[in-house]
């Protein structure tokens, strides 16, 4: 009788537990499910720039060289990419409508970054570890009679005991020079996008990342300086030497500049590069065949001519050759 009652009590507890689990599952099903994060699915999401604190001309910003990134603040309705390192204090409606997509860097860029990281390493810890491994793996030296003392202690007052102390000099190579100024050599534009490419000085100071400064300017004559229409926007930590600016305004002029950065700091901004998007005219050309224009330029080369003392002529010789 007692066993039967105990069996019934056990069945009742099991039924209560099943009922509680069922109620808990129903409560969990009624909770709103979290949205799936598309940023974790696609790592090639484009990023947006940050507005600078003050409004001014891009040329003035480059001359003063006092550009500071805004401090990152949490924004609830921000739709920036997860790759972006900082978010501005403005709401998402005031963020830069211009998007930037970075292409995959070439092998030379990664080679320069790898060379810079290897230069930071110190060879002294490696030598010290190798020495410790040799001591650990090598044969144990036989203790001399002078080292044998009572209870295994070492007699430091024994003059026969010879001790040596040596220190290794730590040698580390750290980048101390700032990176060179990039040179923008090509751009391809249509009515809403622009692909900008610049050079990377291989074999010189390594580059960790680039910064790009962009500003919309009013159309002016060739000899006039561009007039700013709004505040500049900056794109930070760009890996690679080619970027694609998207969602630009048609028939609009832009001005941009690029600078490199490494462990020593940031380099100088390059000269402002001016380009313009094409006008949207579907009456002349169909939408299925958009027109794009590519502009390339070469970096100016400087030639240094040295003249020795033996090649220089005296003043009287010049007067004889070129009489007045």
Swiss-Prot record:
Transmembrane segments: none annotated. PROSITE patterns: FN3. GO terms for cellular component: nucleus. Residues 179-280 form the Fibronectin type-III domain. InterPro entries: FN3_dom, FN3_sf, Ig-like_fold. It holds the Pfam family fn3. It comes from the Eukaryota. Coiled coil: none annotated. This is Fibronectin type III domain-containing protein 8. The lineage of its organism: Eukaryota, Metazoa, Chordata, Craniata, Vertebrata.
